[in-house]
Amino acid sequence: MEFAKDHGFRYVQDELNNVVIYKPGTPGYENSPTVIIQGHMDMVAVKDADCTLDLEKDGLLLEIDGDWVQAKGTSLGADDGIAVAYALAILAADDIPHPALEAVFTVGEEVGLTRGNGTGCL
C-alpha cells in the first residue's frame, strides 16, 4: 500500500490481501479502454528432501549454469515476481502515455486462483 500512497494512487485491498491499484489515463487517453496488468504475489517454496535451508528465514543458494540462474535444492521462488515488478514500473513511470490502468496483484494462484476471486475484479 505504501507504493500506492507514495504515488498518490487510489487502491483497494480486500480481506484476502489482493490489491488493485488504479492509475488514471494520461491526456488524450482518458476515454480509451482501461488496461489491466495482473500478477500474483504469493509463492510456494519447495525444497528437496535433503535440503537443510529454512525457507522462512534463510536465503537461497543460487548457482549460474550458462545463461540460467538456478536455486540449489529449492525452487527459485521468483515465481511471478516479474509481473509485479513490471506493473510497479509501469505505474511509477511518468513518461509513458497510457489509458487508465488497473494493476491487480493477487494471492492464492497456486490453489486455482480461488483467493484472487476476492478482488471483485476477476
PLM features: residue spans?
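A non-catalytic alpha/beta surface segment that caps or lines the substrate-entry region
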Residues: 1-33
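Active-site metal-coordination/substrate-binding segment of hydrolases
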Residues: 29-100, 105, 110-111, 120
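Functionally critical mobile loop/hinge segments
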Residues: 117
